[in-house]
Swiss-Prot record:
This is Protein GAMETOPHYTE DEFECTIVE 1. Mostly expressed in inflorescence and roots, to a lower extent in leaves, and, at low levels, in siliques, seedlings and stems. GO terms for biological process: rRNA processing; tRNA processing. Belongs to the eukaryotic/archaeal RNase P protein component 3 family. Its EC number is 3.1.26.-. It is an enzyme of class 3 (hydrolase). Residues 452-512 are annotated as: Disordered. GO terms for molecular function: hydrolase activity. Disruption phenotype: Impaired progression of the gametophytic division during female gametogenesis leading to arrested embryo sacs at stages ranging from FG1 to FG7. Normal pollen development, but weaker pollen tube fitness associated with a reduced transmission through the male gametes. Probable component of ribonuclease P, a ribonucleoprotein complex that generates mature tRNA molecules by cleaving their 5'-ends. May also be a component of the MRP ribonuclease complex, which cleaves pre-rRNA sequences. Required for female gametophyte development and male competence. The lineage of its organism: Eukaryota, Viridiplantae, Streptophyta, Embryophyta, Tracheophyta. It holds the Pfam family RNase_P_p30. It comes from Arabidopsis thaliana (Mouse-ear cress).
Length: 581
């Protein structure tokens, strides 16, 4: 079972002659292609004329070819096969094209021209009439030799549908047509069509009723199942609606083609060429016995021919281009897929060995640790607190690149002890064994609990600018100023202590606490002053070599007000030498 659409508009050429309008031809081509894609197996190109017919109205409708359809829709064969499978239509069913003429009848003269002897009507496959008044409608139902009566239900009807006339037309084998494109218009038109067409549906009860599109554009063309659903608005059941676009159409086409090809609808008439001979003694060929009652003889398209034509157009494209072999690409991929190490690489990334800094308990930063130190002050107050910043990496002196130092430094443990005395407070820092200073331990029983801190310093040689700390990090001017003030205050305190020792003749019992180079060193005074021999032993133990001071990286010069001053270590050395004398 196949579905038909027997009303595809055809824009007629001008009366003076000529070819089809370019825009109309493109529209007809698109409509035919869309109908074929939706699963229809036959269409009729409808031409409408008004007035008196003439010889110029003979059929000149060119049927569409495979090449023209493929240009519009290259994948037409696959789409047609898909929709035909859904509709249950065999793929071997050819796509057929028919020609149709619709005559608008108003006068009696026009009605008289609708006869079987008119050569203009014989040139078309299907003859339809559209009555414009009551007389034309009655004549078409009773006497006109036509195949189809098409009624315009969009406007107010100029005649009444009489049941006897409708019944007479059905008995004569004439079919009535309803266009569903009128239902897809505005609400007013839809209401008018439904009210007028419902009467015709009730009287015919689906018998000799044909549903066609009459679509002026591609967007108004619907598939067979959609048309069946639309017919519920007119009161048609699904079976009768399906018959209106399939069975009834096929019966009407078979009838009109039989009347056109057979004499008295019994004897087949075929034209022979001048070179062909016919003999009654010879049996008829098999081609003559094979007759398709639905074929008009022209414009039939097989789906296989359509597929072959499509393949032929793509032969050159297949030769010039090579398809991607996705199977080989997928086989080359690892089963577990790509991992991060496959993309980044398996080589280990060399981490720069930099000086490690362990944060103190006071600060939460991972790179900077602050060491607070206090100088000797009054009984209950600390004189001054300074902050020394330390970082993870040391930057080389090369201007073009920065390289972290690769020397692994030994961890140095400093024990900060808060010593209390009758005259002042101080901080004791125990330095590492590699430094040139040896520090004495605090002998006070009132010493506070130890606070452990781990830092690392560099051992590489290199000159440092006066404005940098011993780790090579630039210091702010405020820090430099604080360091300079601390150095001067320390020198003053040492001079005062030496004078007191000279006048009293007693040596101080205080222990000297010296931090790493660049830090403060404080002397805590006590009541008892040791003997000069004890001071000599302390100086020998400290082993301060002033001559080798320039060769150590730990010694840093402190600048104050753009003037160079002696280092703290040199001043301590001189002070201790005077004290020994």
């Amino acid at each position: 079972m196949g579905f038909f659409d027997l009303s595809i508009p055809y824009n007629e050429p001008p009366r003076s002659g000529g070819k089809e309008i370019a825009g109309g031809k493109t529209l007809r081509l698109k409509l035919a292609t869309k109908a074929m894609e939706l699963g229809y197996v036959g269409i009729a190109h409808n031409r409408s004329i008004k007035g008196v017919m003439s010889d110029k109205d003979s059929c000149t409708i060119p049927l569409l070819t495979l090449g023209s359809l493929i240009k519009v829709a290259p994948r037409l064969a696959s789409s047609v096969g898909f929709h035909r499978d859904l509709l249950g239509v065999p793929r071997t069913t050819p796509f057929r094209q028919y020609t149709r003429l619709t005559v608008h009848v108003e006068s009696n003269a026009q009605c008289q021209s609708l006869n079987s002897g008119n050569p203009i009507l014989k040139s078309y496959d299907i003859i339809a009439v559209r009555p414009m008044n009551q007389n034309a409608f009655d004549y078409a139902c009773e006497k006109a030799e036509v195949d189809l009566i098409s009624i315009d239900f969009t406007d107010k009807m100029l005649f009444r549908l009489k049941h006897p006339m409708v019944k007479a037309a059905i008995q004569r084998g004439i079919y009535f047509e309803i266009k569903y494109s009128d239902i897809l218009m505005d609400a007013q038109t839809r209401r008018q069509v439904i009210s007028n067409a419902k009467l015709l549906v009730d009287w015919t009860r689906g018998k000799n009723l044909i549903i066609s599109s009459g679509a002026p554009s591609v967007t108004e063309l619907r598939g067979p199942n959609d048309v069946i659903n639309l017919m519920f608005l007119l009161g048609l059941s699904a079976e009768r609606a399906r018959a209106a676009i399939s069975k009834n159409c096929r019966n009407m086409i078979a009838k009109v083609l039989k009347k056109k090809r057979f004499h008295k609808e019994a004897v087949r008439v075929e034209l022979l060429s001048a070179g062909d001979t016919f003999s009654l003694e010879q049996p008829l060929s098999e081609d003559c016995m094979k007759w398709d009652r639905l074929s008009s003889g022209e414009g039939d398209m097989l789906l296989d021919d359509l597929a072959k034509a499509f393949d032929a157009t793509n032969v050159v494209a297949h030769k010039s281009s090579k398809a991607i072999d996705f199977t080989s690409v997928l086989d080359g991929l690892p089963k577990h897929g790509f991992r991060v190490k496959d993309i980044v690489g398996t080589e280990s990334v060399t981490q720069p060995s930099a000086a490690k800094v362990i944060d103190t308990q006071v600060h939460s930063s991972n790179q900077v640790s602050e060491l607070r130190m206090a100088t000797a002050s009054s009984d209950d107050n600390l004189r001054e607190i300074e902050t020394i910043s330390q970082i993870d990496m040391l930057m080389s002196e090369d201007d073009n690149k920065v390289e972290p130092t690769t020397n692994v430094l030994k961890e140095e443990a400093f024990a900060l002890r808060k010593c209390s005395a009758s005259h002042g407070q101080g901080i004791l820092v125990q330095n590492q064994t590699a430094t040139p200073f040896t520090l004495t331990r605090c002998t006070k029983s009132e010493a506070a609990s130890d606070v452990s801190m781990n830092i690392e310093s560099t051992s590489e040689g290199g000159s440092m600018s006066p404005s940098k700390s011993d780790h090579g990090i630039p210091q702010s001017p405020v820090e430099v100023n604080n360091m300079g003030n601390a150095a001067f205050e320390e020198e003053a305190s040492v001079d005062e202590n030496s004078k007191e020792r000279a006048t009293t003749g007693h040596a101080s019992n205080d222990e000297m606490h010296i931090t790493e180079s660049g830090h403060h060193a404080s002397i805590d005074d006590e009541k008892h002053i040791p003997e000069p021999e004890h001071l000599t032993s302390i100086a020998d133990e400290m082993k301060i070599d002033c001559s080798s001071e320039a060769n150590h990286d730990e010694y840093m010069e402190v600048t104050m007000e753009d003037q160079m001053h002696e280092t703290v270590q040199m001043r301590l050395c001189k002070t201790m030498t005077k004290h020994q004398d």
